[in-house]
Amino acid sequence: MDTNADDGLNNVGSKEITPILKEVTEDAIRGDEVIESLKVKADSEDITPEERKRNVKKLAGAISHSLRGRGEINVRCFGSASIGKGVKAIAIARSYIGVQNLQLDCSPAFITTMMGENELTGICFVTFASERQGKQDTKDSDIIGKCKSVLMVKADPKDISAEDRKINVKKLAGAIAHAIEEGKKTVVRCFGNATIGKASKAIAIARGYVAVRGFDLYCWPSFIVADMNGKERTGICFYVYSNESE
């Protein structure tokens, strides 16, 4: 379990979700089951890259199947490794349901759970499907490429204090909310689970900031590739927007 899962940020700006739906853990997924709430399990550190990819695709299949069946699913994650895995699965699920001319969007919110005597804070991605808007052949990469506002998430140092970590997440949340206020949408780029987790928490907090003006914040993740020091690296970008732009 990621020690950064419980950072106390659920008290800042974002509405906390109380789970009322029947929850299925990742290990209990059946291929034909429509799931209301899915708890993502972090992979073990010694897992092979092939097994890691297989696990993400299994999650993506469960998410997309449930979206087709009931239109919505809660994807619950605790810790950066779990959040990163969940976000990647959601990104793949978006491409899966796109074949049926459906689009996937989500809203992250803070959640809590008890593990023994400890209360852990995590992220729930309220993920939903709707009929795709605009031209059916529009690629996500084209939508992302047209967005002029781009934020790059920087990983925090490993020795950073818990308080400084919270401050950095709130700063990022403020930047996201400001970008939304200025241009109604922004792209948040992440490389590595630590930055994906940081961005997810920041978006959840930014929802609270945007809500003050009477709007809500939504997003969808997509894979990106960048050249870093001569090596190709795959990351995640969140396309973030508010219903003010609708």
Predicted regions and their residues:
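Long, polar low-complexity intrinsically disordered regions
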Residues: 1-25, 30
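Short hydrophobic/aromatic-enriched beta-strand-loop microsegments
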Residues: 96-101, 208-214
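Conserved mixed alpha/beta catalytic, RNA-binding, or beta-rich assembly cores of soluble enzyme
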Residues: 19-23, 31-72, 77-80, 84-96, ...
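C-terminal edge-of-domain segments
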Residues: 102-140, 215-246
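Detector for Asparagine
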Residues: 4, 10-11, 55, 74, ...
